[in-house]
Amino acid sequence: MGERRDTTVIVGAGHAGTAAAFFLREFGYHGRVLLLSAETQHPYQRPPLSKEYLLAQHSTPSLLKGKDSYARADIELCLQDDVLSITPASRQVKSSQGSYTYDHLILATGSHPRFMATLGQADNLCYLSDWDDAGRIRQQLGEASRIVVLGGGFIGLEIASSACKMGKHVTVIERAPRLLSRVVSEAFATFIGDIHLGNGIELRLGEEVREVRRCTSGVRVDAVFLSDGQLLECDMLVIGVGSEPRMELATAAGLACASGVLVDEHCHTSDPFISAIGDCVAVCPSPGHQLPRRESVQNATEQARLVAARLSGRPVPPVQTPWFWSDQLQARINLAGERPAQGQVIVRRYGGDKVSMLYLQDQQLVAIEACNMPGDCLLARRAIGQNHSLDLARLVDADVPLKDALHFA
């Protein structure tokens, strides 16, 4: 009789879960790897859903891995296999297709859009979470001419950008007094907002949708009432007001949860045989010190690599500088590092729609916000956290290449 193989079950086949499966093999893990997905599609890239796909540049999902890659890597991909419950005491997962016993479980359940129950449902009221949602939005965009987007974060602005490129009249409504209030500085948000305004997108900041008006049949929204009483007619309403972690399974299993599934810096949950990664987690490196959830492909990949290395007995890789990107209209936005609450800001203006905002603390570069300057962001990522020497006099001069100001050869 052959020796029993360890089994790692991964719940969720988004960026984090799929990356974890392949990193396990890359790091020499010889156990059984099961990757469970409730979706019908092979694991696919999420970022294009709010951009290229809506513009009909993609008719099928951009897959994370080729369909035959899973069998070649000895990864058991189980599609349309919705996990129903987890029983930590017996280390069992019950799903719509059966049950699995695990030696280690990785939760990569992701997040879902924050729903606005007060607005109800309608055929042309849309949220974006997955491939099916994107298909519905694309269909509605093809029929609509006046689009209202509720939410001035990245998802809302990316969808607004796609609609604008299609020649639609777009209004973005944001309850905060500025765009991107949770993720970028006010100055950078203003810069990005000006690009949207310059392309004809209407921005209604400091406003909320109080209620919707429906057509006679009641199945479609034809207008929204704002908090100031104004009525905006529309053919389509897209809601992008943030996300919530999918942690129902974790909560029901008795795992510690708060604003996400709580994990330490090595992605251990409160159960020693369960890890959690990606958009569903909130890192709590020490008691009472919970970090904000990070929702990005880079973070999902880094956490997947970390857990796979740990389960494979490999050295845990060093933490990388966090980074993020977004495409909006003619703007390529790149962010890296952690913007400090206080510190020095250096703005390098290159003219037109190009700018880099560098954030220093104790004479060290700690973050960058860049628009249409991806090279600056790559250089900054190399310098952040490296105790790198800076030439402040040259750093403030946009005519001096950033490479030279950072003393890179």
From Swiss-Prot:
Single annotated GO MF: oxidoreductase activity, acting on NAD(P)H
Required co-factors: FAD
Designated name of the protein: Terpredoxin reductase
UniProt entry tagged with the keyword Oxidoreductase: yes
Keyword Lipoprotein tagged: no
Signal sequence, start to end: none
PANTHER family: APOPTOSIS-INDUCING FACTOR 1, RIESKE DOMAIN-CONTAINING PROTEIN-RELATED
Keywords per UniProt: FAD, Flavoprotein, NAD, Oxidoreductase
Positions annotated to bind NAD(+): G151, G152, G153, F154, I155, G156, L157, E158, I159
Gene from which the chain derives: terPA
GO CC term (a single one): cytoplasm
Function (record text): The oxidation of alpha-terpineol by cytochrome p450-TERP requires the participation of a flavoprotein, terpredoxin reductase, and an iron-sulfur protein, terpredoxin, to mediate the transfer of electrons from NADH to P450 for oxygen activation.
Domain of life the protein comes from: Bacteria
Organism: Pseudomonas sp
